[in-house]
Every structure is written in structure tokens, then in C-alpha cells.
């Protein structure tokens, strides 16, 4: 979902920083 305009996708999920 990284780079995709989706409100359900958080940056920390894509960057594995959660």
C-alpha cells in the first residue's frame, strides 16, 4: 500500500516502524 492513496494504509505499516 506504500505510495498508494489509501486512507486505510498508514506510513508506519509500509515502513515497518509500527
Swiss-Prot record:
The modification 4-hydroxyproline is found at residues 5, 11. Changing residue 10 to P: Dissociates very rapidly from the fetal muscle receptor. One of its GO terms (cellular component) is host cell postsynaptic membrane. Disulfide bonds join 1-9, 2-14, 12-18. Alpha-conotoxins act on postsynaptic membranes, they bind to the nicotinic acetylcholine receptors (nAChR) and thus inhibit them. This toxin blocks the fetal muscle subtype (alpha-1/beta-1/gamma/delta subunits) (IC(50)=0.51 nM) with 600-fold greater affinity than the adult subtype (IC(50)=310 nM). It blocks the elicited currents completely and it dissociates very slowly from the fetal muscle receptor. This toxin causes an apparently irreversible paralysis upon intramuscular injection into gold fish. Belongs to the conotoxin A superfamily. This is Alpha-conotoxin OIVA. It comes from Conus obscurus. The lineage of its organism: Eukaryota, Metazoa, Spiralia, Lophotrochozoa, Mollusca.
Amino acid at each position: 500500500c506504500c505510495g498508494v492513496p489509501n486512507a486505510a494504509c498508514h506510513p508506519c505499516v509500509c515502513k515497518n516502524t509500527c
